[in-house]
Amino acid sequence: MTNIRKTHPLIKIINHSFIDLPAPSNISSWWNFGSLLGLCLIIQIITGLFLAMHYTSDTTTAFSSVTHICRDVNYGWLIRYMHANGASMFFICLFIHIGRGIYYGSYTFMETWNIGVILLFAVMATAFMGYVLPWGQMSFWGATVITNLLSAIPYIGTTLVEWIWGGFSVDKATLTRFFAFHFILPFIIAALVIVHLLFLHETGSNNPTGLDSDADKIPFHPYYTIKDLLGVFLLILFLMTLVLFFPDLLGDPDNYTPANPLNTPPHIKPEWYFLFAYAILRSIPNKLGGVLALILSILILAFMPFLHTSKQRSLMFRPITQVLYWMLVANLLVLTWIGGQPVEHPFVIIGQLASISYFSIILILMPISGIIEDKLLKWSL
């Protein structure tokens, strides 16, 4: 009798995806973050579901309901902080996962990469709307500032913003719809993740060398299930350390003040994982220009496959582009820092220079260095 694992229509799919999947024998720990993102999504959906059982999406009671969750619900404080810090872990894993993809040229899997870019936008939208729900000061003003950016769209801007708000300002209608979207989006993300994996399994995984690994494949289980398990334990350790010892480390103190439309906080800023994009937005004096730069700062990932000029896929044997890559990473850290600073000298000019270098490295310098490296190796025609 053949193993049910290989014959049952449903179990067979799981088998081909997680058990008997042929995987390259040399993929490093940077390949662990895909499974960790899956874990983060599961944690967020489960904790979010339990939070939704006690949360009320009404402007008069939203803030109180979050307080109620933390004070009165059994382990409510744990669920709330796991959800809040789980979002931070999600983005840490996302940034590393994308960084790995750029470094090792995984963007040449066009379908997988494009679904990944869509996933990034979906996760960012979900996180933004989730931040509005506690209805603290930063929730309210963050929602006001970010939704207001759409008013920069010519002709339809103002109407569009009021349509999203469901009124003439961020109010009850806005909070209710944000809660509805925040609840449904993670399930759409889960569906997109399946499509992401579907496309990945059409080609098989990339590996650090960027070379074809068909001649040397090993089964996913037990090798990579065990390897992923180590990542899982480390992620949970890191998350729970954050939750149990420093729950408010990454949050904003302003969000412990209930939303007040009559009192603007001195420094409106988003969560840390949006600061790099926020810095790019602020570095352009023109409103529409800033919005376009903001969108392009993420959308630029979709152009990655077309900006690849080298005959080598990975950066493993490309020292010049390696230097540019790490300059880009440092640049993003600078942008993240600037995004959290007030709009004054010298932060404005630093932000503008960092924004220019961000786009320059990706659009100009990296493609040029790819051509130079090919010439040095006498590979160019």
Swiss-Prot record:
Any one Gene Ontology cellular component term annotated for this protein: respiratory chain complex III
Required co-factors: heme b
Binding site for heme b b562: 83, 182
GO MF annotation: an example: ubiquinol-cytochrome-c reductase activity
Membrane topology label: Multi-pass membrane protein
InterPro entries hit by this protein: Cyt_b/b6_C, Cyt_b/b6_C_sf, Cyt_b/b6_N, Cytb/b6-like_sf, Cytochrome_b, Cytochrome_b_C_euk/bac, Cytochrome_b_N_euk/bac, Di-haem_cyt_TM
Keywords: Electron transport, Heme, Iron, Membrane, Metal-binding, Mitochondrion, Mitochondrion inner membrane, Respiratory chain, Transmembrane, Transmembrane helix, Transport, Ubiquinone
Gene3D superfamilies to which the protein is assigned, alphabetical: Cytochrome Bc1 Complex, Chain C
Cofactor: binding comment: Binds 2 heme b groups non-covalently.
Any one GO biological process: mitochondrial electron transport, ubiquinol to cytochrome c
Subunit and partners: The cytochrome bc1 complex contains 11 subunits: 3 respiratory subunits (MT-CYB, CYC1 and UQCRFS1), 2 core proteins (UQCRC1 and UQCRC2) and 6 low-molecular weight proteins (UQCRH/QCR6, UQCRB/QCR7, UQCRQ/QCR8, UQCR10/QCR9, UQCR11/QCR10 and a cleavage product of UQCRFS1). This cytochrome bc1 complex then forms a dimer.
Summary of the function given for this chain in its UniProt record: Component of the ubiquinol-cytochrome c reductase complex (complex III or cytochrome b-c1 complex) that is part of the mitochondrial respiratory chain. The b-c1 complex mediates electron transfer from ubiquinol to cytochrome c. Contributes to the generation of a proton gradient across the mitochondrial membrane that is then used for ATP synthesis.
Family that this chain belongs to: Belongs to the cytochrome b family.
Something else known: Heme 1 (or BL or b562) is low-potential and absorbs at about 562 nm, and heme 2 (or BH or b566) is high-potential and absorbs at about 566 nm.
Protein name (Swiss-Prot/TrEMBL): Cytochrome b
Origin species: Apomys insignis (Mindanao montane forest mouse)
